[in-house]
Amino acid sequence: MPRERLLSHGAKSLSNTELLAILINTGRKGFSSIDISNELLKSASNLNELKKSSINDLIKVKGIGLQKAITLKAAFELGERMGRRAENNRIKITQPSDVADYMIPTMKDLTQEHFVILLLNSKNVVIKETCVFKGTLNSSIVHPREIFSIAVRENANAIIAVHNHPSGDVTPSQEDIITTMRLKECGLILGIDLLDHIIIGDNRFTSLVEAGYFDEND
C-alpha cells in the first residue's frame, strides 16, 4: 500500500502512480485508488501536462469527483509555487554585501557559531549552502578536506565561507584568519577558489577580502 510504503521507505521510494493514489485517497466500486491514478496519468502525456489540467479536465477521469479534483489541483499548485521559490532563491554573488544580505537574516540571532559554506557555479550563482560546523571556531576543527569534498561533489566552481559571531563583534579573530588562509591555499591547489570569508554579527558584517586578508602580498 502506498501510505505504508511512504512511512517505511520515504516518499522518494514511491512511483508517480502511488503518490497520486495517496492524494486521491479512496477508490470507487471496482477500482482502487491505484487504478484511478493510472487512468489519471493516461489522461495527460506527462506530469507537466497533468499539472496544467483544469478542474473540469480532472473530473472527466472516472473516479475523480469534485473534491478529489480540488485536492489534486491544490497539490499541483503548491508544487509549482515551491519550484518557483527555489528558482528565485538562487542568488548571484557580485560583491560581499550580496552575501551579507542573503545570510544575515538567518545568522544574526544565532547564539552559537555556525560555519557555513556557499557553493557557487561558474556564474557565481549560489547552488547550495551547507553548515559544516557548529561551535567555537577553531582552525584545527574546520577541515579543508571536508569542505572541499562537498564542493567537488556538488561540482562547485568556487566557495564562500560565512560564519557568525554571537557577540555581535565582527572583528576577525586570529583563528578566523588562520582558517581563511588554510582554505584559500587548499582552494588554489584544487582549482576551487575561496572567494571570500564573511563574518556576521547583529546586522553588520566583515569581508576578509575587503579587509585585505586576501591580498597577494599578505
Swiss-Prot record:
GO molecular function: metal ion binding; metallopeptidase activity
InterPro entries: MPN (IPR037518), RadC_JAB (IPR025657), RuvA_2-like (IPR010994), UPF0758 (IPR001405), UPF0758_CS (IPR020891), UPF0758_N (IPR046778)
Motif (JAMM motif): 163-176
Superkingdom of origin organism: Bacteria
List of residues binding Zn(2+): 163, 165, 176
PROSITE patterns xref list: MPN, UPF0758
Entry-linked Gene3D superfamilies: Cytidine Deaminase, domain 2
Domain MPN positions: 92-214
Keywords from the named record: Hydrolase, Metal-binding, Metalloprotease, Protease, Zinc
Gene Ontology process terms (BP): proteolysis
Protein family (similarity comment): Belongs to the UPF0758 family.
Stated name of the protein: UPF0758 protein SAOUHSC_01763
